[in-house]
Amino acid sequence: MSGARSTTAGAVPSAATTSTTSTTSNSKDSDSNESLYPLALLMDELKHDDIANRVEAMKKLDTIALALGPERTRNELIPFLTEVAQDDEDEVFAVLAEQLGKFVPYIGGPQYATILLPVLEILASAEETLVREKAVDSLNNVAQELSQEQLFSDFVPLIEHLATADWFSSKVSACGLFKSVIVRIKDDSLRKNILALYLQLAQDDTPMVKRAVGKNLPILIDLLTQNLGLSTDEDWDYISNIFQKIINDNQDSVKFLAVDCLISILKFFNAKGDESHTQDLLNSAVKLIGDEAWRVRYMAADRFSDLASQFSSNQAYIDELVQPFLNLCEDNEGDVREAVAKQVSGFAKFLNDPSIILNKILPAVQNLSMDESETVRSALASKITNIVLLLNKDQVINNFLPILLNMLRDEFPDVRLNIIASLKVVNDVIGIELLSDSLLPAITELAKDVNWRVRMAIIEYIPILAEQLGMQFFDQQLSDLCLSWLWDTVYSIREAAVNNLKRLTEIFGSDWCRDEIISRLLKFDLQLLENFVSRFTILSALTTLVPVVSLDVVTEQLLPFISHLADDGVPNIRFNVAKSYAVIVKVLIKDEAKYDALIKNTILPSLQTLCQDEDVDVKYFAKKSLAECQELLKN
């Protein structure tokens, strides 16, 4: 599709020509030139050697169309764009395809929408995947604007042209357009013809076309599910044949798409209350789960809970899925085990018999928790704790807790992090006491991990844990740890630790913050405060806490400490004090009557002093904060 840019359409003068009018030209010629200008300008820009310029020009199509008006857009711009669509680079085509999907208002409304179809059909046949995808999206957008008559007279023939073209690219695009017509066709014979055409595509020789068929089939089935009274048995004969083509294809890149197709088919029959096909569909599910191609097994594993949910009305069907599920847990491909590890709790909830969970599922979980692949163990850790909701307290303590505690000691940090992040449900069932002995060492070890990103991750989990574990446990076991992060060697960790204190205050309240955090920060060793970084960190922490503590705490504890740093020897400290003052005034102004004197007699004079500072940065931030404070007082 790409190539040298065309210099045809020479009948329209260039921008340079149209922008210059002879002094001898009459008014009529001048008006004519001005009316040609937008299109001529676009043409000039689309002849530019630099592709970036041509792409930018194409992004302005809507502006050009507005300038031209609907009639000239239809008669001049669209024919010109049809030429461009056959003679430029893929980057330009992609923008053109996307723009045309929003073009119906610019050509005069839906009654003229079919004029956009030929150029989009050209783009939908492009070699470049991105161009085709943009064109298909735009065609589907335009189709929504079409009347029934336009749909039948123009859009359906367009699908037929693409579906019967010689090139696979056109056929792939055709597959993405059926969704715009499948439920708008009320005539059974016409819909049958459409499905027959889709079946024809499913029998194509090229895997690319068959993949497009498999990818789009669930969308078509879901549309029929939303319109249950529309489809006939004959429609489903076609759909069944298409599904069989996909599930029996010899290419795993086609066959794995059968999993989503099967789920959609099951949803349709479940919505209809029709169980006559369920056993056959279960057989198809088992076939896919045990397929020799690992990609097919992976897809079945990844969708296992969704698949199982479609059989949940009959426990006998669920029971038939237990062994295939266990086989996936022992699959020789790590990616398959990783996918199914995330599905354990989701599948187990469909098992009515706790003994199956205890005797079959938990042993599989035990094996997965010790899997040689750390990504499998991490995947299991991210989802497994919900299984406790299916067991009583004694069963959790005796059968599941040992697995969980072992995972809290896993050598891979992500496993421990994922378990810690999802402990609330376990805590709700068995209480924190049984977890604490293993939980605290895991948290402490993660908090000291040499990888700062691991330390960052555990900091981000702390507020979640705080909500789960409660204030008393937190104060006894974790508050020291939270303060210790303020002195980390990595700035990002110190910053995260400061924000962490704010989130904890939002959970536990201002009084807790005053007693457990602020009082300890203000009692730090004077020798420690000789370090600039320590002073800066405490200043940053106290400033961050200003919006989440009571005004009394702000005025009695935070403000005095911050103010005494106003004459600090380090300019960086002084200008951060200036910024802190603005934060403090912003909260004190909520009770201006009470704190007006404090603001005017303490904060503003200090800011005015800082405005005279010898350091330019201090002066800049002091003046900025002073202006903010004065504006707050004025309002």
From Swiss-Prot:
GO-annotated molecular function: protein phosphatase regulator activity
InterPro entries: ARM-like, ARM-type_fold, HEAT, HEAT_type_2, PP2A/SF3B1-like_HEAT, PP2A_Regulatory_Subunit_A
Signal sequence bounds: none
Region: Disordered, residue numbers: 1-33
Highest taxon in the source lineage: Eukaryota
Residue windows of the HEAT repeats: 34-72, 73-111, 112-150, 151-189, 190-228, 229-273, 274-316, 317-356, 357-395, 396-434, 435-473, 474-512, 513-553, 554-598, 599-632
GO biological process: meiotic sister chromatid cohesion, centromeric; mitotic spindle assembly checkpoint signaling; regulation of translation; spindle assembly
Segments of skewed composition (Low complexity): 1-27
UniProt entry keywords in alphabetical sequence: Repeat
GO cellular component, one term: spindle pole body
Assembly notes: PP2A exists in several trimeric forms, all of which consist of a core composed of a catalytic subunit associated with a 65 kDa regulatory subunit (PR65) (subunit A). The core complex associates with a third, variable subunit (subunit B), which confers distinct properties to the holoenzyme.
Entry's free-text remark on domains: Each HEAT repeat appears to consist of two alpha helices joined by a hydrophilic region, the intrarepeat loop. The repeat units may be arranged laterally to form a rod-like structure.
Database matches in PANTHER family: PROTEIN PHOSPHATASE 2 (FORMERLY 2A), REGULATORY SUBUNIT A, BETA ISOFORM-RELATED (PTHR10648:SF4), SERINE/THREONINE-PROTEIN PHOSPHATASE PP2A 65 KDA REGULATORY SUBUNIT (PTHR10648)
Entry function: Phosphatase 2A affects a variety of biological processes in the cell such as transcription, cell cycle progression and cellular morphogenesis, and provides an initial identification of critical substrates for this phosphatase. The regulatory subunit may direct the catalytic subunit to distinct, albeit overlapping, subsets of substrates.
Family: Belongs to the phosphatase 2A regulatory subunit A family.
Note: Present with 16900 molecules/cell in log phase SD medium.
Name recorded for this polypeptide: Protein phosphatase PP2A regulatory subunit A
Species the sequence originates in: Saccharomyces cerevisiae (strain ATCC 204508 / S288c)
